[in-house]
Amino acid sequence: MDIAHDLQSIGAQEQALVFPHFDPARAWALGNRMHALATARGHAIAIDIVTFGQPLFYAALAGATPDNADWVRRKRNVVAHFRRSSYAIGLRMQQAGASLADKHGLPISDYSPHGGSFPLTVAGAGVIGSITASGLPQRADHEFVVEALCAELGQDYAALALARS
């Protein structure tokens, strides 16, 4: 895995995966799409979709644990703070050889810069929330969310997927 290349690719994902509008019905449709995809693949994950301050969708699939719910919360907090993918922030910290606690004073008990939370962006409004998955390895959590967003937004996932490591 090349960190610089992944960061460039994640930036392209964040630019491309923008909703024209977003409401609770769209959150429900996206959440159900993610649930069906995860179920078909046998993923034991938690799925979370929020606008900042309001939960819109949550599901814990068979095999997911309370730890997954806490990882969701901590990854979601990274997106809320930085308005960037939690994976991008984690890769930046890795590049810098620093932690969120060292560099930004953010406690690991509340912030986790691991892959799986992606900014929910609306055209003309910016980042309004996050879409998060937890239960797979961090790169796979990130790509699961991106794949679902591509399907929901009619984007070509193959063109936006991270390079295979």
Swiss-Prot record:
It holds the Pfam family HbpS-like. PANTHER family: PTHR28255, UPF0303 PROTEIN YBR137W. Belongs to the UPF0303 family. This is UPF0303 protein Bamb_1459. It comes from Burkholderia ambifaria (strain ATCC BAA-244 / DSM 16087 / CCUG 44356 / LMG 19182 / AMMD) (Burkholderia cepacia (strain AMMD)).
